[in-house]
Amino acid sequence: MRCPFCGHMESQVKDSRPSEDGAAIRRRRLCPECGGRFTTFERVQLRELTIVKRSGRRSPFDREKLVRSISIATRKRPVDPERVERMVNGIVRQLESQGETELPSSAVGEMVMKALKSLDDVAYVRYASVYRDFRETSDFAKFLGAEGLSDVADDEL
């Protein structure tokens, strides 16, 4: 594997063990060129997934993009990163088990919303505000009212 520090094409595996949730193999590596140490994760990929965007454009499913979007929603919240990782693993498993190679981005978004709702209400609302493209405070009020998360009426904003 290429060293992320110096770009050398080979590295040595110094330690290998399953991750805590058993969904990946964690490997500690050493670059013989620069001495840099880094960690890699190896995961099973059942099939290549393609996400169909709202615009109709297609792009390969990017697990790290999913992790980043959820991490942004949970930032500065009392949510354990391991719970986020388990949640992402569950969403990926659901996507792969659907048997489809092309999935609409809305399916991914709805799965994330459902998972975040059970994880943290604030993270759920943060994610929804981007996913549902809230433009005004009234959009938040309508969403919170529909979800039963608030008694705020539109005229109180």
Swiss-Prot record:
Keywords of this entry: ATP-binding, DNA-binding, Metal-binding, Nucleotide-binding, Repressor, Transcription, Transcription regulation, Zinc, Zinc-finger
Domain ATP-cone: residue ranges: 49-139
Pfam families listed in its UniProt record: ATP-cone, Zn_ribbon_NrdR
Domain of life, source organism: Bacteria
InterPro entries from the UniProt entry: ATP-cone_dom (IPR005144), NrdR-like_N (IPR055173), RNR_NrdR-like (IPR003796)
Zinc finger (unnamed): 3-34
This protein's record includes keyword Amino-acid biosynthesis: no
One of the record's GO molecular function terms: zinc ion binding
Purpose of the protein: Negatively regulates transcription of bacterial ribonucleotide reductase nrd genes and operons by binding to NrdR-boxes.
Assigned protein family: Belongs to the NrdR family.
Annotated protein name in UniProt: Transcriptional repressor NrdR
Species in which this protein is naturally found: Caulobacter sp. (strain K31)
Higher taxonomy: Bacteria, Pseudomonadati, Pseudomonadota, Alphaproteobacteria, Caulobacterales
